Structures are given as structure tokens and as C-alpha cells.
Amino acid sequence: MLKSFCRKAAVLFALVFFSLPVFSVSAESDANRSSSYLYDSEGNVISAPQSYVYSNTVTASDIGTAEFGELVDIANDKEGNIYFLDKKNSQITVTDKGFKLIRTIKAFTNGNEADSFKNPSGIAISDKGNIYVADTDNGRVVILDKNGNFIGSIGAPDKKESQYVNQYKPSKVEVDKSDRVYVIAENQTQGIFSFGASGKFMGYVGATKVKPNLAELFFRSFASKSQKKASLQFVPTEYSNIAIDDENFLFCVISAVDGKALSEDIQSRNGTVDPVRRLNQDGTDITIKNGSFPPVGELTFDPYVYGSYAGASNFVDVAACGGGMYSVLDSKRGRVFTYDSQGNLLYIFGGRGDQRGQFNQPCALIYNGDEILVADRSRNSVQVFVPTEYAKLIKSAITEYNTGEYDKEYESWKEIALNFSGSELAYSGMGRYHYNNAEYSKALEYFKMANNRKYYSVAVKKYIAQIGRNVQPFVISGVIVLFIAFKLYGVIKKRRAKAPAVRRRTKLTRLSEELKYSWYIAMHPFDGFWDLKHEKRGGAGAATILLAAATLANVVFIRFKAFTFNTFDPEQDSAILKGIEGVTIIVLLWCVANWSMTTLMDGKGTMKDIYCYMCYSLLPVIIMLPIATVVSYVLPIEGAALLNMISTVGIIWMAFLVFCGTSATHNYSFGKTVATIALTVVGMLIILFLFVLTITLIQQIIAFISLISKEISMRT
């Protein structure tokens, strides 16, 4: 009989399980997503005004020269001249800012001999106007003046300087204001080559150390010396491109990023995976990551899916725009992501496709004034994008903040917010303005609108201190008045003292005593629970009131704790339902499961006894959650650990009372109590599973009946 029932249950479960639709959490399709969007502070995709719009496309025919063979890089100088690097034809095409041909550099004189490039991959222009070319297959960096005359070259470091260079093939090059040269070479993972102005090898910068997991450490402990030495050679990071900003720091990007690790990093918001880095002269990463998420490009992607449009962003270039702003180019989706100096995402534009403003194989980008130029390798063309008023306002606000023009900055953010109500960045900017003017209440409003909990926390501290200074005289006066009143009350009470009147024991009086008894139980759990059952010191009515109070405390904590620590969205969820789920449902599940288990384990408690001791055990929740709610309003964001500790103390205290209540009610030993609690938890999970299964079956039956009825109605 039992075997037959089990077989039927298993078949039924299998049918239901495999008939359920497969749900997957995925972002909006990349193919259908608008090219103008943003991510809010919760990682949700939101529509945003256009930041940069397509202006025109530049090809070799537009310049008036032979077709490009393979356009791989672009650069510009201080005069606005544009340099197009053609890898296949091994030449440089130079135009003015209007894309009129100035010259083509294909060959040059090196000493007394003719020389030329061989499959060059990268180009950079110094502040002096000199041209630096990563001459890949010749294994050197060629330096030319602005007219294309040979100045010199930088070859590979010798073996004494670098033991890791086997075949030196530079792919990207950059030069700073001091003429220090930085080179990325193919298949070199020790970092970026750094050369002095004279061409002397200075060492590597930006090398990334490996963080092996436990399995790698385990196998490494059994490896030989040669195996350990070999294992060091495959792990460091290989950069894909570099750029120098206006403060002479080095921006670099990484294209090969572990999608799974990056996805976990986005969820935790730790910023430990760094596809974008800003390095100082020592090679230390000084990238600021104060944004809601680290600067990683796309936030919503499937880390287990790979392909032309799937997975993490693939950064192939980076360009600095001044004022700490920078843009990175994602070749996977053809999008440009722009961030400010704090790591806040400002705007996104571009996309993959054949339309104007879209790319097939984007490979390089530069700023030319306010314009952004993006090179497309497969089309052998450059698309020019111009900023909209929205992008200009953002840049103006950032520039005005950097120069100390805070009133103008506020007006810029205000205009942005008027045209784009979803701009959390604008609300943060306005909140910062009010904060700097000591208008903390207004600052709190804007920081809350911006979902900026960090600055909200800082403003709360200032606001509380400001209120404290304003009400301090009234508080002192009130304390004095209360002290005097308390003393007078004591004197009057003594004078009017009489023999205690005989109290009449009513239902209300008994209920009050039963509620007060919950405190005795909290302080003396073993004696308290024994008397609760055997001396009838409590009742179901008081237990129900305690259950309702605990549920209410949970609802208030979920809904009304300070914004600094509160991620609850009343538009998406119900605090009442969450409060009931967190307390009432758990208590009821416990009662049913515990009664079921103790019935089989010679328990002495009835269902009423179990219900009473469980509800009386909730007093710590009733005490600690309101305390945590109030304390949350005076704690900074760094006080999250203290807030968690307060609620954790309540939960641990409650768990101890549940243990004592189970032991006293059922007259169990320590070991049997532990076993009963463990089995009760398992029973709760089974009941919950059966409940969900029943609901699912009912839904399937209703859907089936609905489908049949529709089919019948259509046939008739």
C-alpha cells in the first residue's frame, strides 16, 4: 500500500514538474534594446535621453585617398588633425579636423636606408606632435615627427632587462606628457611595457597578480618546481588598449574578462574584477568606484552564454575626455559607455548593426573636441558622433563642480532633472549642493530620490547634529521639568497613600497578567515555560496578541527603517505580506510540524501548548526590531553591522526561548530537543513543498479546464 502510494506520488510530482514552464531571469534582448538607455542604482534598465547622435561617416574615398585595407586605430593631435592607421596597407593617413587629406605616411628614411611599417596595430600622438607607431611585425615602436620624418625607434628589452620577452610584437602604444612610452605587446602578460623618453626600458606597470582558488592551491602543493614555474606564466592579465588622460595617468582596458566572476562582482558590487583601470606612474590602480556599480559596461548578461552579443562587455579601447570623464568601447555590442571620475555611469550610445550610428566591428575611439570618433574595422570607416544638449549639460555640470562654480552646477543638474526625471545623477548633484550649503533636510530629499544611500547616510548625521543644536535648550528644560514633576508626584503619592484596594479579577486583568508574564519567560525561560504549561500562567489569547505584535514589528521594520538601510520598494512588494511571511506563517508552520513530530516522539505538549510557547518566544522580536528601526535613523551607512547585530541578537534570543519552550513543553532531554527541532525544520520544508505542489496542481487543473472549455466553445 505504502509503496503504491509512493509510486503514484513520484509520478504525479514528475508530471507536474516537467509540465511547468521554464522561467529564466534575463535582461531585455540586446538586439531589441534601445541604443539610448541607462542602468539605475538597482541595476534596472531605464530609458534615457540621447547623449551622442550620429553626424557623418568618413571613408577613404571621402578623404580622397585609396581605400583602406584594414583600419585598426585612430588618433589625433592638439590641432585636431586625425591619424588613420591602416594595418593591411601599412600606412598612416593624416587629415585635418575637416577630414581633408594632409599627407600619407607609408615609408620613411631610417639613417640612409628606406624603411617602412609591417602590419602596424597602434598609433599615438605626443603633445609635441610626434607620431608613435606600434610596428607590430617589425617588433618595434617607430617615432616620427609630424611631417613623417624618422626620429627613432624603441625595440624589445634585452634579456637582462626582461626575461619574459620571447617574441616582441607591440600592438598598442601611448605616450604621456613627459614622453614616457607605454606599450602593449601581444602574448605578454607581465603588464604594460614602460620606456623612458630616451627609449630605455623602465619595467612593467599594471601587472595583475593571480588569485588562485582552493583547488589550484591544493594541486599546487603537490606540483614539482618546474610545474610551479610554468603555472606562473598563464595567469596574469593581458591588456587590450591604453590611453593617457589630462592628468597624465594611464587608462587601460581588458577585453578577456571571466563573465561568471564579473557577474558575481556586479551582484556584490565589490569592484574586484577590473576591466577598466587607471594607473599612476608606479602602476597602482587608482580607479575610483563610487558609482552604484563598478565600471564594467553591460550589467545584465548571462555569464554562461557566449557569442557575438552575449556575455560580459569586451572592451577594446578607452579615451579620456577631461574633467575625469572617460569612455570605453565595447566591441561585443558596439556600445560606448561613458563614466565620470567617481565611476558613475553617465550615458550609453551605439549598438551592433548596419544602420547609421551602429557598428560591425568597432576597434578604436577618440575624443576630438566634444565629438567622439569611432573606427569600424570591418567597414574601414570612422563614424562621427556629436553631443546632444543632454550630454553637454552633464559635461557642464561636472566641469562646473570641478572649478567650484556650484551655483551654475546646481542649475545644470536641475535642467537635466527637468528633462530626465530618472536621472539619479542629477538628484545626487542637487543633493550635494544643498548639503554643502548646510540645507540637510533638502539634501536628504534629493539623495533619497537619487537612491544614494551613501550620501544620504552622511547627510543624516549632519541633520541630526543640526537638530540637536537647535533643540538642545528645550531638551534640557524638559528634563528639568520632568524631574521636578516626578519628585512632586512622589511626595503627593506618599501623602495620599492608603491601604491597597481589593482588585477584582476580570478577563482584561487576566489578559494583562498573561501578557506581562511573557517578560518573566524571556528572563527565566525554563521555569517560565514550565509554569506556562502546568500552572496555566498564559493563554491562547495573550499568545495571539504577542504573535500579532511580532508581525507588526516585522512589518514596521521592513517598511519604515531608515532609507540608508532600506531596499524595500512599496511599489513592487507589500510590507504586510512580507511581515506575515516572516513571522506568522513561520509560527503556524512550526506549530503543525512540531505537533506532527512530537506526536511520534512521545511529546507531552498539545497543539495549544505548542502555539503558546512559540508565540511567547517572540518577545525578543517585539523588543529588538523596534529598537533596530529607531536606531537605523541615527546610524551612518557604516553602521550596518551594528544594525544587523541588534536584529541578530533578537533572533538568537528568540531561538533560545524556542529551544527552552520545546524542552519544557514536551519534557525532552537536551539531545532529544535538538533532534526534535531539526526534524521540525525538515517537516516545515516538507509542508511548504506540499503546499506549493498543491497550488501548482490546482493552477494546472484550472488552466487545463480553461483550455478544454475554450476548445469546446470554439468547436461549437
Write out the residue ranges for each language-model feature.
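Eukaryotic scaffold repeat domains enriched in small/polar residues
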Residues: 28-411, 415-433
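Selected alpha-helical membrane-embedding segments in polytopic membrane proteins
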Residues: 508-608
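Alpha-helical transmembrane segments
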Residues: 480-494
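Hydrophobic alpha-helical transmembrane segments and adjacent short intramembrane/lumenal linkers
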Residues: 577-581, 590-692, 697
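TPR alpha-solenoid repeat register
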Residues: 426, 459-460
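TPR/TPR-like (Sel1-like) alpha-helical repeat modules
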Residues: 435-457, 483
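Register position in tetratricopeptide repeats
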Residues: 402-403, 436-437, 470
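Juxtamembrane/start-of-transmembrane alpha-helix segments at the extracytoplasmic/lumenal side
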Residues: 460-478
